Amino acid sequence: MSSTVSNPQGILQPGSFLLPESESMKKEEAELVSVCWNQDSSCFAAGTSHGFRIYNCEPFKETFRRELKDGGFKIVEMLFRSNILALVGGGPNSQYPSSKVLIWDDHQSRCISEFAFRSEIRAVKLRRDRIVVVLEHKIYVYNFMDLRLLHQIETQANPRGLCCLSHHSNTSVLACPGLNRGEIRVEHFGLNMVQIINAHDSSIACMTLTLDGLLLATASTKGTLIRIFNTMDGTRLQEVRRGVDRADIYSIALSPNVQWLAVSSDKGTVHIFSLRVRVVGEDSYSTENGALLTQQNYSNSLQGLVSPTIGTNPGSSLSFMRGVLPKYFSSEWSYAQFHVSEVTQFFAAFGSNNTVAIIGMDGSFYRCSFDPVNGGEMGQLEYIHFMKMDNRP
């Protein structure tokens, strides 16, 4: 598989790319094609059949939208709250190919670079110094400044486009499916080290990293267990149970303080779990100076500690018989729950002050709160149908 990178001066002129809303566009309701959180979950992007829209979460408002004459995008990847986005065509009647990434500068209203491939792009991930393009069997890692190809990573079939990055400036970690079923490959670029984690017996369905890349949370296509790993040595630190029945996991989110984990699935419940691990210490990765921390010290910077300040996940009433009864009876179950529709995909993320934000492919936005001491059913604080908002910017 090869790729082509270009700096398309004059290829996509602003006037030919952006289009003011015509009367036909105003009459035709835009269809939601995709939703995606930005790196710190303060905003999310919605790809539509007409273009894309950007929403702020606290307070909730549409910050801007772009209507395009040639259809919409199936991938709209933000770079925190900056003016840079990665766009991949898709959706009804889109004229933009699904095999090309456009790097869009919204301040200049133009495409500043593009990446063309020979097969469909499954995902694009951004951090301030890297552009990562995910194909079904390969991942390309580029330097953001000069668009130089830095790494190529082979994976097993990856139709979901699974890949996640660290976002601290002093770490550079990438996690993706490995070459074997249930395997995850963790690249520590600063340490020039690869860690292979045998996470599940079934294929990987969902994964996420903490912002510093020290912790990895995973789920398989079975969808019953979520596991948390140390990315340095592959140690499993904790395992929690979503349920007994098979489920399709849509999202896994870790709170910034690494005390909570949220999971959404096709079962119509968003689960919150209490984590017993937290990050202690810092690493010293620098993109200029390379790895300033030894592998041993880096590994020691992550310790599994019991936190006395938060509640614990409930276990089975028969957990006293662990070792005698099956593993199920010693499982940790969710600490708090919120119920949504089972007929559409929902993606959860943590907000401030023990809140969770949930966005759905039906155009719904929920904000709910959970009790960090007692757990239980979460309370709904806000509901908005963001595709039908009247207060446009």
UniProtKB/Swiss-Prot annotation:
Signal peptide: none annotated. The keyword Repeat applies. Disulfide bonds: none annotated. InterPro entries: PROPPIN, WD40/YVTN_repeat-like_dom_sf, WD40_repeat_dom_sf, WD40_rpt. Expressed in roots, stems, flowers and leaves. Belongs to the WD repeat PROPPIN family. This is Autophagy-related protein 18c. It comes from Arabidopsis thaliana (Mouse-ear cress). The gene is ATG18C.
